[in-house]
Amino acid sequence: MKTLPKERRYETLSYLPPLTDQQIAKQVEFLLDQGFIPGVEFEEDPQPETHFWTMWKLPFFGGATANEVLAEVRECRSENPNCYIRVIGFDNIKQCQTVSFIVHKPNQNQGRY
């Protein structure tokens, strides 16, 4: 019986193959269509007990586009290549984070997590 190699899994979409930039943009478009406010966070070693990640700049309050968010993901990826990077979505009605997914893992191909 063939088994998959052991690998840490994090949050939504982590059991799927790595996302391309185009797939990340589609997920961000979904966040925007739902009225969520996107943001980018990074963490060097995300252990289960680590509840707070470092925010990359500020969340995109106002009229953000998927391309603007993707540009920030790329910039965060180039500044922090040894960190896990995720996109998050805030719901300003419920006043909480509603969505998050990993877009970059260290030691992976560029353009994919």
From Swiss-Prot:
Family listed: Belongs to the RuBisCO small chain family.
Source organism of this protein record: Synechocystis sp. (strain ATCC 27184 / PCC 6803 / Kazusa)
Assembly with partners or alone: Heterohexadecamer of 8 large and 8 small subunits. RuBisCO interacts with the C-terminus of CcmM, and can be found in complexes that also include carbonic anhydrase (ccaA).
Organism domain of life: Bacteria
Molecular-function GO term, any one: ribulose-bisphosphate carboxylase activity
Gene Ontology, cellular component aspect: carboxysome
Protein name: Ribulose bisphosphate carboxylase small subunit
Note: The basic functional RuBisCO is composed of a large chain homodimer in a 'head-to-tail' conformation. In form I RuBisCO this homodimer is arranged in a barrel-like tetramer with the small subunits forming a tetrameric 'cap' on each end of the 'barrel'.
Subcellular location(s) of the protein: Carboxysome
Protein's UniProt keywords contain Chloroplast: no
A single BP term in Gene Ontology: reductive pentose-phosphate cycle
Keywords from the UniProt entry: Bacterial microcompartment, Calvin cycle, Carbon dioxide fixation, Carboxysome, Photorespiration, Photosynthesis
Keyword Protein biosynthesis: no
Function: RuBisCO catalyzes two reactions: the carboxylation of D-ribulose 1,5-bisphosphate, the primary event in carbon dioxide fixation, as well as the oxidative fragmentation of the pentose substrate in the photorespiration process. Both reactions occur simultaneously and in competition at the same active site. Although the small subunit is not catalytic it is essential for maximal activity.
